[in-house]
Structures are given as structure tokens and as C-alpha cells.
Amino acid sequence: MDANLIEQKSDYNKIKKISLLLFILLILSIIAIIVLIIVLVTSEKSKTNEQNKQNFKGFNYWVEKYNMMDHIEGGKFQYGLYASNFKVNLTGFEDLERLGTSTCYYMLNSKEPGKFHKLKGDECWLFHDGTPLTMYLMNETSGDIQTKLLGLCDECDPLICVKGGTIFGEIGGEQYTFVSLETVPGYDDRDFTLYEKEELLNKYPQNKEIIETIYPS
């Protein structure tokens, strides 16, 4: 075989090996950069979560500050924060006349969910402190459930409004979730319906898993 041809072939093999080595190094560099980005993002999220936890006032702080009481549907509350002086007459409401709006403080945690209930009027939930709260909004006719997160996380909304006639329940954050509620028209016991576990299971068996989460015992 010609010496020049042998030398060219040898040079080609060397270039091929070097190219392969450079390609491998490039792939490893890309992987290292991706891993570094993941580590930095995870670290930043952990740092943010830790800062948020440190900023929490605490479950007992709010209970004591506002002298909150046990609520029939679960959690703690303090009613009478604000009630409008204006009164309205509405079709479909017993005795028709209601306050224009009213507000209260409410607090839940994962061990003390808010049982499924229904209001004739609308109710808006405003997040104040703690970890995100999960809300289950169920259509009374079809049983279809929409899940929403109340809080300040990327997937959350700090304000969630529930339309009157919706059956809904909630599970507070791992530590607690402190919120305020605004009811329109103003809250009245005659407009409130609380559901029992068996009643819901019989009517909406397709929602058994969520119902049993709200009613653990």
C-alpha cells in the first residue's frame, strides 16, 4: 500500500477520534449545564419556601388575635368583621331582604378540612397567610368538580370567587391557611346548606375519592 495513503488514513482516524471525543465532551458539558440549572432552580424554590415558612405568623397567632371559634363545617372562624348597612331584596331568598355584603375571617389546615356546603349567594375567598388551600367546586346537577388553589404559589390565585348554588369544600395547607371571606348578599343561616358524607356519596358516587378526603372519618 502506498505510504502516503497509509499516512492519510492514519490522519483521518486521528481526526475521527478527536471529533468523537469533542462531541462526547460537548454532550457532557450540556448535561452538566442542565443539571446545574436544575440544582439552582430547586435551591431557589427551597429557599423561597423556607423564607415563606419563616414569615408565617402561625395558626395559634391568628386564633388568639381574632378570638376565632370552631366552625360547623370545620376550621376556625370569626364572624362580624364587616356587615353592610345597605339591604337588598332578592328573588329566591327566604324573606327576600338581605344585607348587601358581609365578611369574616376563616382558617383551615390539612387535618381539619371544610366540609362540602352550599350558599345561595356568591362568596369570595381572599388569601392572607399560610400555605395554599385546595378548593373543590362541585356542580350540583352533574357532580362535575373543578379544583382550584388559593394562595400565592405559581399555580395559585390569591382571590377565588364561588358562585351561589355551587357545592364546595376545602382542604387547608399543610400548616394552615388564613383567609377572609366576603359573602354577597350578606351571610344568613337560611342561605347555608351543610352536606353529610353519606348524602354526597349516594348522589355523587363518581366523586368518592374527593368526598372521603374532605370527610376522612
Segment roles from a protein language model:
Residues 1-16:
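Intrinsically disordered cytoplasmic terminal tails of membrane proteins
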Residues 164-190:
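Ligand-binding loop in jelly-roll beta-barrel domains
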Residues 52-159, 176, 185-188, 192, ...:
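Non-catalytic, conserved peripheral segments adjacent to functional cores
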